[in-house]
Amino acid sequence: MADSSFDIVSKVERQEVDNALNQAAKEISQRYDFKGTGASISWSGEKILMEANGEERVKAVLDIFQSKLIKRGISLKSLDAGEPQLSGKEYKIFATIEEGISQENAKKVAKIIRDEGPKGVKAQVQGDELRVSSKSRDDLQAVQALLKGQDFDFAVQFVNYR
């Protein structure tokens, strides 16, 4: 019988992020407490730019955006938001969407699988993802349950289950 496998990835659908951003922008434009504050959220290249005329307001914009991401099923571990910075009369927050598993994080995950996972399960780093293979599908499901119970500082998805 051939080996079964799945990939561990950290990916975010850009369209879902765009939808969350548009929903947040619409809510900001309609809320009474944001009238006249210059609060906005938009794409700035690959970054997301949030701005308002007060530090509390720009943090509130970030909070709204985070709530929209959660509603769209995107993990907040994928969002890397900076600190509010004063720029002229406005405060700005730049945020990026983190994708891919770094080499050191992939090694940590592989070590957890080796140490705590079932015997006979192999984990190989392939670029920014991790391939886990075994002869038994039950072992692969046990590895998935093990990894879901871990608290990583990056989002984890399982794809290509074969």
From Swiss-Prot:
GO terms for molecular function: nucleotide binding. The keyword Nucleotide-binding applies. Pfam families: DUF520. InterPro entries: DUF520, UPF0234-like_C, UPF0234_N, YajQ-like_sf. It comes from the Bacteria. Keywords: Nucleotide-binding. GO terms for cellular component: cytosol. The keyword Nucleotide-binding applies. Belongs to the YajQ family. HAMAP family: YajQ. Nucleotide-binding protein. This is Nucleotide-binding protein SGR_2909.
